[in-house]
């Protein structure tokens, strides 16, 4: 499918400045597209866990232990400043088989940036990730605050699929692990990509909530997969 057709499809729906469309078989071919995906792979009761703003020891390390114990793979959306500070944690994330996502260098609002500015930022962030893990594949890009601006096309051109989310558990002000786990229960729908945080503050309650909810989801027949990937 041609890039011009991708652009026509992506332009059809604009939500909060981001390009978002219902997944279709037509977009499943070729490389990344500027369409922001918010859907987990597979059919039926599937869900994807994604974690933003890290790496952030010790919380990221505790989270990795929970995911490893439960045989779950997730997406980690990494901020360049944090990658530079904690490259050893990035190596651990990749070594344990999780998927990497570029979350910009400084967690800036990109909505008013030019394509050239966005490209420079994303390229610098990816370079830091590759310094930590030379063999890493950076599959996704997620715009800070969901302020996409012109970043979806830039990310796609750099080989990264723009990654959105179906819902955010709002863990930036920790209300308690039980409350966070209940938010997942209440908001969960088949195919959801869930936004959580392992960085940006004390995320111990998020780690506890994840440890609570995974066995419950499995018992109810949910499968934890990765988000859709165009290409």
Residue ranges and their predicted role:
Residues 29-113, 117, 123-128, 137-138:
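Active-site beta->alpha N-cap acidic-glycine motif
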Residues 1-28:
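Secretory targeting and sorting signals
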Residues 9, 104-105, 199:
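Compositionally biased, intrinsically disordered low-complexity segments enriched
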Residues 62, 84, 108-218, 222, ...:
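Catalytic domains of cell-wall/extracellular-matrix polysaccharide-remodeling enzymes
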